């Protein structure tokens, strides 16, 4: 067993029988009381965020997470199909396990599948940045504004993001999959 001194941000721990991601934590020593560690935890299954206080030095159970790079093959309804490029083993992942980044998964691209406890799927981490083609964009009118203006565009995966007015249909853009924000236009 590990102690609270082993905590790290984004670590997966088992707390009260459920898996949680450590969003943030800090050590607190109030006057003449015993020191404590205050953790902000996000439940993996429900997505609910809680704040938990434990004594400094108390034991915590760290869940060993294994990352395996796999190729995204295709989507069938709300099931995503991935393949291990070394063993050619295929797995199915439900859309709710992937979460928001699902809208940035492009066929034949690589993503990291997170496993725990004898090959149970914890989630999917797509690449931090993806390059996608703009399939739908409204036309920007010259002289329309005096300041920076963004417009909504639809990408080839169906995701809708906000981009600067100079981005047109058919352009390629780089997107941050963690936030869903436009980074740059690719020439």
Curated annotation (Swiss-Prot):
InterPro entries: Elong-fact-P_C, NA-bd_OB-fold, Rib_uL2_dom2, Transl_elong_fac_P/YeiP, Transl_elong_KOW-like, Transl_elong_P/YeiP_cen, Transl_elong_P/YeiP_CS, Transl_elongation_fac_P. Keywords: Cytoplasm, Elongation factor, Protein biosynthesis. Pathway: Protein biosynthesis; polypeptide chain elongation. The keyword Electron transport does not apply. GO terms for cellular component: cytoplasm. Its main location: cytoplasm. GO terms for molecular function: translation elongation factor activity. It is found in: Cytoplasm. The keyword Lyase does not apply. Pfam families: EFP (PF01132), EFP_N (PF08207), Elong-fact-P_C (PF09285). GO terms for biological process: peptide biosynthetic process. Belongs to the elongation factor P family. Involved in peptide bond synthesis. Stimulates efficient translation and peptide-bond synthesis on native or reconstituted 70S ribosomes in vitro. Probably functions indirectly by altering the affinity of the ribosome for aminoacyl-tRNA, thus increasing their reactivity as acceptors for peptidyl transferase. This is Elongation factor P.
């Amino acid at each position: 067993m590990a102690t609270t001194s082993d905590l790290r941000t984004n670590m997966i721990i088992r707390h009260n029988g459920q898996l949680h991601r450590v969003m943030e934590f800090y050590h607190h020593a109030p006057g003449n009381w015993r020191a404590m560690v205050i953790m902000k935890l996000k439940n993996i299954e429900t997505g609910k965020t809680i704040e938990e206080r434990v004594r400094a030095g108390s034991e915590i159970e760290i869940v060993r997470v294994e990352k395996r790079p796999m190729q995204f093959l295709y989507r069938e309804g709300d099931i995503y199909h991935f393949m291990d490029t070394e063993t050619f083993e295929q797995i199915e992942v439900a859309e709710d396990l992937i979460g928001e980044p699902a809208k940035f998964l492009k066929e034949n691209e690589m993503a990291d599948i997170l496993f725990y406890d004898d090959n149970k799927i914890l989630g999917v981490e797509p690449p931090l940045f993806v390059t996608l083609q703009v399939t739908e964009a409204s036309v920007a009118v010259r002289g329309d504004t005096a300041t920076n203006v963004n417009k909504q565009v639809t990408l080839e995966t169906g995701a809708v993001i906000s981009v600067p007015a100079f981005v047109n249909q058919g352009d390629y853009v780089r997107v941050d999959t963690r936030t869903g924000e436009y980074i740059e236009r690719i020439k």
